[in-house]
Curated annotation (Swiss-Prot):
It comes from Ureaplasma parvum serovar 3 (strain ATCC 700970). CDD domains: RNase_HII_bacteria_HIII_like. This is Ribonuclease HIII. The gene is rnhC. One of its GO terms (molecular function) is magnesium ion binding. GO terms for biological process: DNA replication, removal of RNA primer; mismatch repair.
Amino acid sequence: MAIVSVKLTSNQVDKFLILWRPYLVHNNHNYAKYTFKIDGTLIIIYNTNTCTINTHDINSFLNTFLKREDLTLFNVIKQQVNTKKNNQNVMSQSEIYESAQVIIGSDEVGVGDLFGGIVVCAVSLKKSDFKKINHLKIIDSKKLNDQQMQEIYQQIKNQISYTIVSYNPKEYNELIKEYNNAHILKTILHYKALQSEIHKHAKYSIFSVVDAFSSLKNWNQYLQKVNFQPYEPNLLIPKAESIYTSVALASIIARVMFLKMIAIIEEQFNVKIPLGSSNPLVNDVASNIFQKFGLKILKQVAKEHFSNFQQIIKNK
């Protein structure tokens, strides 16, 4: 599913209502004027006349349900959709804030590292929060070094709302054996972090964004597998940290927390822990820990299902 946002005039909103009145559904959203559900597609028209269309295939939807009904309206929306496609087809922060008071973004760190577990952070930002953080020039964490992220975290940790959830390596290994799918573990943590922030901001209208690691279909299947209540983020999108400030901050905070997890391992074994999994130094350090302390201890600091972990214990 993808969300496309378009701006309508009052006359165009009236046309929508005439065309799709049979598809009107109830919506508790404080800022929603009309909500329609048409063959699996959700359309919300807000008080600002911003219209969001949540659908699997925007072109198919427009051609099927609008082109034959009102060609003029079809062309207006089609033009806006095509413009957005040229700009990655995503809603901007300013568009979201027209219809939501809080943007919650979540991201995870540690999934590609042999050592350490995984950390997920969800960050909530109201428009007013930007006054506190604009001077920091928040960008994609992949473009920041560890020192820069630490400095940003120290400046924002008491200024914004966020939730951190994690699995240490021992917990991670136990759950991987149970579910045999790292995506399920990530979904659990994202879900818990998002729900925590949603609960904190229950009186606000919320828009949630997750840095995508799976499709929405799989996300729902993972939640069903672990018997969690259904919840769909408003947007699952790759590289969300480069688009939405809340996700960028979530990535930074999660990275800082993951580095703290690594620092504990370093202190425990008095060794510098290399990050990643393909670096030859990773194998060297893991082999040394295995040889000195045994398999039980290695399982407490590293991800057991990684191929190099298996190779290390195989070559003992």
